[in-house]
């Protein structure tokens, strides 16, 4: 199994505000689709609720401690240990608590860095480039729908870190 994080954060590592993304960036949604189609997304229940439905053409797994949680098209797990039982390429998809729990266990991270500062109440955990090697860094294209400068980073964990 390959275990990756996929996330977008601003310069202050904001990832959300009031259970929503603080920005609208279609390029990032397209990037997520390209990377995760055919693979597995693991997200916490509140993240799933903010999306409202399973993302198509991938396995959607929701981590929750609510025994009554059920949604068509979603597999439910109740512990972090169950993530290790998944196969294929697994993407950790948020939110904050799940990122905090998994950042030291993932092989790599796909990060969209939003070049701005947004109001937020949820954050991506701190990370340093001491532990991560930049595999690629691509500037996002700006247009009438994508007006916020952004960079797509692929970071790979350094050996022994």
From Swiss-Prot:
GO cellular component: a single term: cytosol
Organism of provenance: Staphylococcus aureus
Residue sites binding NADP(+) per the record: 7-8, 15-20, 44-47, 63-66, 93-98
Function noted in UniProt: Key enzyme in folate metabolism. Catalyzes an essential reaction for de novo glycine and purine synthesis, and for DNA precursor synthesis.
Domain DHFR: 2-157
Record has NADP as a keyword: yes
Entry-linked SUPFAM superfamilies: Dihydrofolate reductase-like
Reactions it catalyzes: (6S)-5,6,7,8-tetrahydrofolate + NADP(+) = 7,8-dihydrofolate + NADPH + H(+)
Top-level taxon: Bacteria
Family: Belongs to the dihydrofolate reductase family.
Pfam families: DHFR_1 (PF00186)
Keywords of the record: Antibiotic resistance, Methotrexate resistance, NADP, One-carbon metabolism, Oxidoreductase, Plasmid, Trimethoprim resistance
Gene3D superfamilies: Dihydrofolate Reductase, subunit A
GO terms of molecular function: dihydrofolate reductase activity; NADP binding
Annotated protein name in UniProt: Dihydrofolate reductase type 1 from Tn4003
Biological-process GO terms, alphabetical: dihydrofolate metabolic process; folic acid metabolic process; one-carbon metabolic process; response to antibiotic; response to methotrexate; tetrahydrofolate biosynthetic process
EC number: 1.5.1.3
């Amino acid at each position: 199994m390959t275990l990756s994080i996929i996330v977008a954060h601003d310069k202050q590592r904001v990832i959300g505000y009031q259970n929503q993304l603080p920005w609208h960036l279609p390029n990032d949604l397209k990037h997520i689709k390209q990377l995760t189609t055919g693979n597995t997304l693991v997200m916490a229940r509140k993240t799933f609720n903010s999306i409202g439905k399973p993302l198509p053409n991938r396995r959607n797994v929701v981590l929750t401690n609510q025994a009554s949680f059920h949604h068509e098209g979603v597999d439910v797990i109740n512990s972090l240990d169950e993530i290790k039982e998944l196969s294929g390429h697994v993407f950790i998809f948020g939110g904050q608590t799940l990122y905090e729990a998994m950042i030291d266990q993932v092989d790599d991270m796909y990060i969209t860095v939003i070049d701005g500062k947004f109001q937020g109440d949820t954050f991506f955990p701190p990370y340093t480039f001491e532990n991560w090697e930049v595999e690629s860094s691509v500037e996002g294209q700006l247009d009438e729908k994508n007006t916020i400068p952004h960079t797509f980073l692929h970071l790979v964990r350094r050996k022994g870190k």
